[in-house]
């Protein structure tokens, strides 16, 4: 089966009982070793279905609007559309992608904090009326270019103000909300609700307590000014673990009952992104170069072996100018799995992992302990479904990794039993036999 670099015409392999994702990865490693050793993804769409079931079981009162920029692969968007999620879009292209799947405009919100006028006009043209806004200038742009806009006022949380760099730029203060509401009234812009965002890195449950209290204050302010608000967006920040989802629900559920009880007419939504897709994708990369260095060249405080032992720098065929782009703005906590078999008592060496660009920024893992690897060996990175699918840089002729989609028969049956269908997606399934033999050159050669 070919992997789809432009996966608009993707196919999905249905795994027979006895075939697991590890078998599939083994086989593609074998194929890619023979044909060019390019990096590749394997996506398990069944995990997305499971995440949605988990969401419905834990926080059924909150409608998810999937954050498209997190992973806009057509297969991902199509399965989420079939599951009935909404979509949070940051650009014209993202809005167009989900509308091509037949998603109605009322299930799309335009969440970019800094909107281009042409894209506001596009949203107005296609009927995407729900937008977010956190300042007067954006409010005036919306008033001039989107006559049917319904705005969610984006408020800052203590988490944002406290200094997470990626978030502190966005969200207005509670103190400024009355001014913005009065401006909206003068501009005849309809304010329909409030949005806030708590990052996944935040460990303080009190941030949700304060954010929901602030949101209630803004609802009350809006009522005094003459707005009737009916939507609360609690943002993203969901990591994907059931434990974290239950923890958040434990905090917010009683507060929602107090501030926005059932029957109040307020619809509660959220913007999960990595929650749905992170664990669904695995990335396989190849070692293309290797250097032996002195152990003391590694910074103090990182995991190291004895100073008299060698250390290794490994260069991979994917990096921050490709699938690891998010490493430029956040830490990567994933330590890869070595694909080749090695003995349990094989010595481990201090190692660092780098992308292929030779740029000092292209360091993927600063330090980890690995057995000695050779050029041509493979490393497997789990949880690579979020923020990994950007267009690669043209530098050094980087190639976008192929994507191979899979789903177990049990997950497929679960979809059918739940009444989840998509005509176009159903055409893309093909059967994967359980007898994958890595010794055969043509193994797993079924075409979509």
UniProtKB/Swiss-Prot annotation:
Function field: Antizyme inhibitor (AZI) protein that positively regulates ornithine decarboxylase (ODC) activity and polyamine uptake. AZI is an enzymatically inactive ODC homolog that counteracts the negative effect of ODC antizymes (AZs) OAZ1, OAZ2 and OAZ3 on ODC activity by competing with ODC for antizyme-binding. Inhibits antizyme-dependent ODC degradation and releases ODC monomers from their inactive complex with antizymes, leading to formation of the catalytically active ODC homodimer and restoring polyamine production.
GO CC annotations, alphabetized: cytoplasm; cytosol; nucleus
High-level lineage: Eukaryota, Metazoa, Chordata, Craniata, Vertebrata
Quaternary assembly: Monomer. Interacts with OAZ1 and OAZ3; this interaction disrupts the interaction between the antizyme and ODC1.
A matching Pfam family: Orn_DAP_Arg_deC
Tissue expression as described in the entry: Expressed in liver.
Organism: Homo sapiens (Human)
Primary residence: nucleus
The keyword Ubl conjugation is assigned to this record: yes
UniProt keyword list: Nucleus, Polyamine biosynthesis, Ubl conjugation
Family of the protein in this entry: Belongs to the Orn/Lys/Arg decarboxylase class-II family. ODC antizyme inhibitor subfamily.
Modification after translation: Ubiquitinated, leading to its proteasomal degradation; a process that is reduced in presence of antizyme OAZ1.
Protein's UniProt name: Antizyme inhibitor 1
Subcellular location: Nucleus
Site, Not modified: residue positions: 69
Tree of life domain: Eukaryota
UniProt-recorded Gene Ontology molecular function terms: ornithine decarboxylase activator activity; ornithine decarboxylase activity
PANTHER family given in the database record: ANTIZYME INHIBITOR 1, ARGININE/DIAMINOPIMELATE/ORNITHINE DECARBOXYLASE
């Amino acid at each position: 089966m070919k992997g789809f670099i432009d996966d608009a015409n993707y196919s999905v392999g249905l795994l027979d009982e006895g075939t697991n994702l590890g078998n599939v990865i083994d086989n593609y490693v074998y194929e890619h070793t023979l044909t060019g050793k390019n990096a590749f993804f394997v996506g398990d769409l069944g995990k997305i279905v499971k995440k949605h079931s988990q969401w419905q079981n834990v926080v059924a009162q909150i409608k998810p609007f999937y954050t498209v920029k997190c992973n806009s692969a057509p297969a991902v968007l199509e399965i989420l559309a079939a599951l009935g999620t909404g979509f949070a879009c940051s650009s014209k292209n993202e809005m167009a992608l989900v509308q091509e799947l037949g998603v109605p405009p009322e299930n799309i919100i335009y969440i970019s904090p800094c909107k281009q006028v042409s894209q506001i006009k596009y949203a107005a043209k296609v009927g995407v009326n729900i937008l977010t806004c956190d300042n007067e200038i954006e409010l005036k742009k919306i008033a001039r270019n989107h006559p049917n806009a319904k705005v969610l006022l984006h408020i800052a949380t203590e988490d944002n103000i406290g200094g997470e760099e990626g978030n502190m730029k966005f969200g207005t203060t509670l103190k400024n909300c009355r001014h913005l509401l009065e401006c909206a009234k003068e501009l005849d812009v309809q304010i329909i609700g409030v949005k806030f965002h708590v990052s996944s890195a935040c460990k303080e449950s009190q941030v949700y307590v304060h954010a929901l209290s602030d949101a209630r204050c803004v609802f009350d302010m809006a009522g005094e000014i003459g707005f009737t608000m009916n939507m609360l967006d609690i943002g993203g920040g969901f990591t994907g673990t059931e434990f974290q989802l239950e923890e958040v629900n434990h905090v917010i559920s009683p507060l929602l009952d107090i501030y926005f009880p059932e029957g109040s007419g307020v619809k509660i939504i959220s913007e999960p992104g990595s929650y749905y897709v992170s664990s669904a994708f695995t990335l396989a990369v190849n070692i293309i170069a290797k250097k032996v260095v002195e152990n003391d060249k590694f910074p103090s405080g990182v995991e190291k072996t004895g100073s008299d032992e060698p250390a290794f720098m490994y260069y991979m065929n994917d990096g921050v100018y490709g699938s690891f782009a998010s490493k430029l703005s956040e830490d990567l906590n994933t330590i890869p799995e070595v694909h080749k078999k090695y003995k349990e008592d094989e010595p481990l060496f201090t190692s660092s992992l780098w992308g292929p660009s030779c740029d000092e920024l292209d360091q993927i893992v600063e330090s980890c302990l690995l057995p000695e690897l050779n050029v041509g060996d493979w490393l497997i990175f789990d949880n690579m479904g979020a923020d990994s699918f950007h267009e690669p840089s043209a530098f050094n002729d980087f190639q976008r990794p192929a994507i191979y989609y899979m789903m177990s028969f049990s997950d497929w049956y679960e979809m059918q039993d739940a009444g989840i269908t998509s005509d176009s997606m159903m055409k893309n399934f093909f059967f994967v036999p359980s007898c994958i033999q890595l010794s055969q050159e043509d193994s797993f050669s079924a075409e979509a």
